[in-house]
Amino acid sequence: KARHMLARTTAAMAGGGMYDQLGGGFARYSVDRGWVVPHFEKMLYDNAQLLGLYARLGTAQGDRVAGETADFLLRELRTPEGGFASALDADSVGEPGGHAEEGLFYVWTPTQLVAELGPDDGAWAAETFGVTAEGTFEHGTSTLQLRHFPTDPDDQARLADVRRRLLAAREQRPRPARDDKVVAAWNGLAI
């Protein structure tokens, strides 16, 4: 029973909005019971411990999520000195002189998906990631969720291509601030 609960919980976390479906890594916590909307802050200590958990699951999903989380840590939190920064903020500023908005870097609308991917891949991505016109977050935006990882090799290749293209598009958005404080204990969890 405990293994079933672990498998179900880790699958729900990895498929929900708490997990960054494009860039890897986990948000600090979810603000709803369905794990759709995260508090978008990404902490080193959470990701270090979750990386270890997913790596020990011994499943294809665990291996994928552990690898993507490790990539996130190395790409987003590694400092020039070789340690890891403490966190990425939940907020980023959209317009010059504007105010910080939670989740702005991470959320999408169907229109944005079509603009980045074209009509076919945009519609496919909206369906695959649960992005709706009503939105799952604020102002008609949605967090990306991947409740069912494709099993068909063609769909897996399409998903990889869509994720790569959306990640590249997201990199053009205003980024959340990074807390460059290097905490030895948190770094110890990550290495």
Predicted segments with their positions:
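Glycan-recognition and catalytic cores of secretory/periplasmic carbohydrate-active enzymes
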Residues: K1-I191
